Swiss-Prot record:
It is a peripheral membrane protein. GO terms for cellular component: plasma membrane. Its EC number is 7.3.2.5. It is found in: Cell inner membrane. It catalyses: molybdate(out) + ATP + H2O = molybdate(in) + ADP + phosphate + H(+). This is Molybdenum import ATP-binding protein ModC. Residues 4-240 form the ABC transporter domain. The lineage of its organism: Bacteria, Pseudomonadati, Pseudomonadota, Alphaproteobacteria, Hyphomicrobiales. It comes from the Bacteria. GO terms for molecular function: ABC-type molybdate transporter activity; ATP binding; ATP hydrolysis activity. Residues 299-369 form the Mop domain.
């Protein structure tokens, strides 16, 4: 990270667009990647257009790092806003080479002119474009075209990068090829990003913060893990509910092929290729892969058993209970979810505040980092 991160991104957009009503207000840190997530047609792209100045709603407000882009007296037009915009499909100039497309939006004086600017060579390296510079867009694959579009947006030296479902037009294999490039940008650049998607797997891999939308409304905005573990929100009650946790690689056991990860509230063992100690890793733990025990189990095939406290609970239908766990002695660590039957809940006589043990049957690493699952055997 080379620059001091902007303080916040705030938006307030309300109004009717034909038969669609938008009621979106949010404030998120202007650092890292903020996912804008919800089902198709909920208003995600409309919010992005409002941030970009492509859609003007009376009474709207928008400021980034204290700079007002829209209020009662101000409305900056799109070309006046320091943004980069990446659309669902790359809009490249067909008569220009990849190099010329990349440099098209760069400020005069060269892409490296401004202090703290993202340099041309850096963008080429981050996005793996060096072998494509002399090609025409018609000779690129869909994934290559989108990487060029991202590079062009970065070289415009934006203060905020807006990405409107940039992978939605690509097949799953191509998506999996591009996601590591986006993660590399996230790790190396301080540029804040608003990333629109209706694909939760993209959000789980990329986002630090989340704006959750449904039917034109912002349901909540905040850190990804907080929204994932809030039983009042649909992410936590979904059948495939999971929580993402950022961890640090601590050691590697080459005999058993197991990586020890340190997270807030304990340590986990995960099958993995060798990695260097100190490397950051994002893991995903599904609610269905966590079971509960009153006492520490002995002689079990489950590798990961951590002390935890029940933070809160919520019924899920007539026969299940969603349990929000806080890891570590005293429950001061990371949050996880567990989904148990009401019979198990009653038999264990559980209640909020109880201390117990979380048996974690499955831990998934992000795919590009050597995806693996730690099974119960």
């Amino acid at each position: 990270m080379r620059a001091i991160a902007p303080r916040s991104i705030r938006g307030e957009f309300r109004g009717r667009l034909g038969g669609f009503a938008l009621d979106a207000a949010f404030s998120v840190p202007a650092t890292g990647i903020t996912g804008l997530f919800g089902p198709s047609g909920c208003g995600k792209s409309t919010v992005l257009r409002c941030l970009a100045g492509l859609q003007r709603l009376p009474g709207g407000r928008c400021d980034v790092d204290g700079d007002v882009w829209q209020d009662e007296a101000t409305f900056l037009k799109p070309h006046q806003r320091p943004i980069g915009y990446v659309f669902q499909e790359a809009s490249l100039f067909q008569h220009l080479s990849v190099r010329a497309n990349l440099l098209y939006g760069a400020p005069r004086g060269g892409a490296d002119a401004a202090e703290g600017a993202v340099g041309f060579d850096e963008v080429i390296e981050l996005l793996g474009l060096s072998h494509l510079l002399d090609r025409a867009p018609r000779n690129l694959s869909g994934g290559e075209r989108q990487r060029v579009a991202i590079g062009r947006a970065l070289l415009s030296q934006p203060k905020l990068l807006l990405m409107d479902e940039p992978l939605s037009a690509l097949d799953r294999l191509t998506k999996d090829e591009i996601l590591p490039f986006l993660e590399r940008l996230h790790a190396r650049l301080s540029l804040p990003v608003i990333y629109v998607s209706h694909d939760i797997t993209e959000i789980e891999r990329l986002a630090d913060h989340l704006i959750l939308m449904r039917a034109g409304k912002v349901l909540a905005a905040g850190p990804l893990t907080e929204l994932q573990s809030d039983p009042a929100l649909p992410l936590a009650t979904a059948r495939d509910a999971a929580v993402n946790v950022d961890a640090i690689a601590e050691s590697y056991d080459s005999v058993y092929g197991l990586l020890t990860l340190r997270l807030d509230g304990g340590r986990l063992l995960v099958p993995s290729a060798p990695v260097q100690p100190g490397e950051a890793r994002r893991i995903r733990i599904a609610a269905g892969d966590v079971s509960l025990a009153r006492e520490a189990p002995h002689r079990t095939s489950i590798l990961n058993i951590l002390p935890a406290r029940i933070a809160t609970t919520s019924p899920v239908g007539p026969n299940e209970v969603l349990v929000v766990l806080a890891l570590g002695p005293g429950g001061q660590g990371a949050r996880l979810l567990a989904r148990v039957t009401r019979r198990s809940w009653d038999q264990l006589q559980l209640a909020a505040g109880d201390e117990l043990f979380a048996q974690i049957k499955g831990v998934a690493l992000a795919p590009e980092r050597g995806a693996a699952r730690d099974s119960a055997s």
